[in-house]
Regions:
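Short S/T/G/P-rich N-terminal loop/turn motif that feeds into the first structured element of a domain
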Residues: 1-67, 74-238
Length: 238
């Protein structure tokens, strides 16, 4: 079973019990490109490492320095097996090609709620927007209640902003974080949606004020835009 390269993962796939997300700081756009090439080579040249790994995707940060890694797993045991048996060889090859990569925190998530693309919508995801929210302590009920509050605020709009495709809210298994994995046609569409007068995404309203001022939020996190760089899954027949 080898890697099959695809255009994007499916965050809503039913067999994905967990998602892992982390960031690498590689420093420059040139090193971003070199790291993506090294990742592709390291994975294409080996057997798929574990049947419990359902997809692995890499996104290039708009900042020209970072790479976001998003992977889907059948469960934590599958990930731990991969760490023991398959991660080091790949990372060693990547590090040899691009020395000095800074690997930042890895977080584990479960998909909680999605705003899905409409039936028949075949638009390509040209920009991934990650919106992070952090809370002052573990509270799974609070995570989910905050996401529900976001959906209530989004429900005020008659339709998605131009260029918006889908939003997938993930809650961390430690109870302290939420990310919105938001698919957009382009970065320009997302920028325009934020800047839209009066009714832009997150514009002042009682419901959006509840989102921004939710009890226990630390003010950490932020909004980050990425360009899809690489996505893969097990080959057919594996």
């Amino acid at each position: 079973m080898t890697a099959h390269f695809t255009d994007r993962p499916d965050p809503t796939r039913a067999d994905a019990r967990l998602a892992k997300a982390s960031t690498w700081n590689v420093g420059t756009r040139r090193r971003q490109r070199a790291a993506v090439d090294a990742i592709r080579k390291a994975w294409a040249g080996r057997e798929w490492p574990h049947p419990g790994l359902l997809s692995y995707s890499v996104y290039a940060g708009e900042d020209g320095a970072t790479l976001l890694h998003y992977s889907q797993w059948t469960g934590e045991h599958a990930y731990q097996d991969f760490v023991r048996e398959g991660r080091d060889l790949r990372n060693a090859e990547i590090d040899a090609a691009v020395p000095g990569i800074e690997r930042l925190e890895l977080h584990t998530y479960e998909l909680y709620r999605s705003g899905l693309r409409a039936a028949g919508d075949t638009r390509q995801t040209g920009c991934l927007v990650i919106v992070e929210a952090e809370f002052d302590g573990p509270d799974p009920a609070r995570q989910r209640a905050w996401v529900d509050t976001v959906f209530e605020a989004l429900g005020e709009a008659a339709e998605l902003p131009a260029g918006g495709i889908a939003a997938h809210f993930h809650v961390s298994t430690d109870g302290t974080r939420v990310i919105n994995y938001a698919e957009w046609e382009s970065a320009e569409h997302h920028i325009a949606a934020l800047a839209a007068p009066g009714d832009g995404v997150g514009s002042p309203s009682p419901r959006w004020e509840r989102v921004h001022d939710y009890p226990g939020m630390t003010g950490g996190g932020g909004v980050h835009r990425y360009t899809p760089a690489l996505s893969m899954e097990p080959g057919v027949g594996g």
